[in-house]
Amino acid sequence: MSIQIYKPNKTNSGFAFSFYMGENLKDKIPSLFINAISQHSWDDKRKIGSFSGSKSDPEKNISIKFNHFECGSIISAINNRFEWNTYHAYEDNKTQIKLSPWDKVITNTKINSKTKESYEEKTTIPAFGIVITRNGNQVFKIPLEPGEIECIKILCKSIISKYCDVTSSANRNQEKSKDNISSDYEF
């Protein structure tokens, strides 16, 4: 499962995020990966943003790996609407990751069934935002709509479920190996 979210804008300050499950080749333990890239350009005629020009600039993109416990924390933060922070250090990079809830006001157009007139109604919906800050000055951020955050939550649940399956299978195989080994000692 892979989730791609692109949010370019005309001020050329948008970002694209990718969320996906990867696994360790040796033991098949799954992890959540988040890749983020800064918007490179904006085509005002076509009203579309491009990210590909930032691909080769290491300061314009980032990749982060999360374990199953961090996936559990993400799910808990989403379900209980609290801010979740974590810190990763790799080589010379120090990275702060923050998932924050916020209330987004949207406007819906509705039709009055009696008068057949349209009217607008404001509604507050639960949204989230992710901000990733590397080395204090490289910032990657994206707002997340309710549907997007639900998909991320399902991806995190899938990773935890697969982790449980893999480790349970490994434990069963280990037990079978112990049964096949004869020993003069009992433990």
Predicted feature descriptions by range:
Residues I3-Y6, N12-G14, E23-D27:
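N-terminal intrinsically disordered, cationic/polar leader segments
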Residues F19, P30-Q39, P126-I132:
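Short, hydrophobic/proline-enriched secondary-structure or compact coil segments at domain edges
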Residues M21-K28, I64-H68, E120-T124, N137-E150:
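Short, low-complexity cationic-aromatic patches
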Residues D27-G53:
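A short, structured beta-strand/loop element
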Residues D43-I64, R134-I142:
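A cross-kingdom feature marking solvent-exposed beta-strand/loop segments within repeated
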Residues S50-K55, I62-H88:
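Compact, well-ordered interaction domains used in eukaryotic information-processing assemblies
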Residues N85-I130:
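Intrinsic, low-complexity N-terminal interaction/targeting segments
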Residues V131-F187:
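Mixed-charge, glycine-accented linear interaction segment located at domain edges/termini
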